[in-house]
Amino acid sequence: MRYIELAQLYQKLEKTTMKLIKTRLVADFLKKVPEDHLEFIPYLILGDVFPEWDERELGVGEKLLIKAVSMATGIDSKEIENSVKDTGDLGESIALAVKKRKQKSFFSQPLTIKRVYQTLVKVAETTGEGSQDKKMKYLANLFMDAEPIEAKYIARTVLGTMRTGVAEGLLRDAISLAFNVKVELVERAYMLTSDFGFVAKIAKTEGNDGLAKVTIQIGKPIKPMLAQQAANIKEALLEMGGEAEFEIKYDGARVQVHKDGEKVTIYSRRLENVTRAIPEIVEAIKEALKPTKAIVEGELVAIGEDGRPLPFQYVLRRFRRKYNIEEMMEKIPLELNLFDVLYVDGVSLIDTKFMERRKKLEEIVETNGKVKIAENLITKNVEEAEQFYKRALEMGHEGLMAKRLDAVYEPGNRGKKWLKIKPTMENLDLVIIGAEWGEGRRAHLLGSFILGAYDPETGEFLEVGKVGSGFTDDDLVEFTKMLKPLIIKEEGKRVWIQPKVVIEVTYQEIQKSPKYRSGFALRFPRYVALREDKGPEDADTIERIAQLYELQERMKGKV
């Protein structure tokens, strides 16, 4: 299958904002895809090369990419760099360079999707001494044979700056439409495996029956079940039917642990493989987990010198560290508090009631200094739960989780079977969709950021406010550097940005607002942290903001 067909799909997707049209375009394309291509083409459509849980990274920045194009076209790197000032997009500038190419090999072959994919895999798997030169040559070989439109989208794929507006929900709907299968079965299969390539292939070859049989697989992370927030303990108990399991809510990073014999793999909430960054937890898991094969979930917490928990950002620092890991183990010791088990020795437990899963967890875990089981309380009594809540806060934790005793595990769902109880309103994780250049000495920096929440109905990120406080000068330098390559268009001092970067914000309150299409505005938002553990698909939705607005009003006693 020719790569130009995929490039033309990207171009069509870019030209429309209509979700239904995009879905139909992707579905029609998927119908034509050979069976042996379905394992990787869904990721290319998303603008990726690998699933998010795959450790492989391309490791190619703008400079290396420009050098590869220069090698392929004979056009000086500086000329390509200068062109970006006019086009505002490196992909467009690379397309222009290929159009002006000074030579094309006599043996040039039209690019196939398979060749492009296999080359990108080779680029990702090339490491060590001399790897940058090898990566450059692999890419140059693609650009030598590429048409301008192909070069544009190869470049965007390499840099992770595709602008087609295709996200997980749209791809799910397109798979359902292409292969005439139930969308809820596609959703379920994806939530269980986090692998669109696998799901698309099953949908095409085995239809609804095959999708219905999809189950958990060790080595493919499950989308985590999520919780809403309750106003207080009393509300949580009422929602749970009068009795609930209360667990300490740790201020850490949620992880999913897959054990397969001596092999242990640990995934972050965003399903990224963080195993190498936390070797002491890997060893502790091998000792603590009795079954040969198991999938468990827990909260990874950083512990301070006083034995109290440190903010979750410390855990993220551990995740990011690729070198001198032993030094970081000393500086930021970690502790894993397990709270659920989803799979044991060939048996999926997601359709098992929560209390049975909790008992199973206690049976299969032998706690040690690094691996513990989350402290809990099962009660019908509000006062007893209040005392537990008070103790959790005194210990430096975030609050409590309340869980329905008969709840099955619902991957990817944020329902009311799990509820958080915290002393303050929940912070929001929102996507930066635009920004404004600063004033005076900050004129060269982006100084305030337009925040967007995801609307699953349209696939858009809708504005809910603008944040300019809480940032240090260093933060603004870093955000400007990070966001500049993602700028889509400029309107005076305002720029619009590809929705890729998620930040956590606090706010005084949520207000209803006719000013924004979202219907809501944040009052006095303030930057808290960059959420590197979350992608745009993990950001808070308009529906979630509506739920928090109702919760806020209940807390005020207005509802």
Curated annotation (Swiss-Prot):
UniProt keywords, alphabetically: ATP-binding, Cell cycle, Cell division, DNA damage, DNA recombination, DNA repair, DNA replication, Ligase, Magnesium, Metal-binding, Nucleotide-binding
Catalytic residues as annotated in Swiss-Prot or TrEMBL: K249 (n6-amp-lysine intermediate)
InterPro entries: ATP-dep_DNA_ligase, DNA_ligae_ATP-dep_bac/arc, DNA_ligase_ATP-dep, DNA_ligase_ATP-dep_C, DNA_ligase_ATP-dep_cent, DNA_ligase_ATP-dep_CS, DNA_ligase_ATP-dep_N, DNA_ligase_N_sf
Pfam entry (one): DNA_ligase_A_M
GO molecular-function term, one example from the UniProt record: DNA binding
Cofactor(s) required, per the database record: Mg(2+)
Keyword Ligase: yes
The protein's Enzyme Commission number: 6.5.1.1
Coiled-coil regions listed in the entry: none
Catalytic activity: ATP + (deoxyribonucleotide)n-3'-hydroxyl + 5'-phospho-(deoxyribonucleotide)m = (deoxyribonucleotide)n+m + AMP + diphosphate
GO biological process per UniProt: cell division; DNA biosynthetic process; DNA recombination; DNA repair; lagging strand elongation
Binding annotation for ATP: E247, R254, R269, E299, F339, R414, K420
Keyword DNA damage set for record: yes
Matching NCBIfam families: dnl1
Its job: DNA ligase that seals nicks in double-stranded DNA during DNA replication, DNA recombination and DNA repair.
Family, similarity comment: Belongs to the ATP-dependent DNA ligase family.
Name listed for the protein in its UniProt record: DNA ligase
Organism in which the protein naturally occurs: Pyrococcus abyssi (strain GE5 / Orsay)
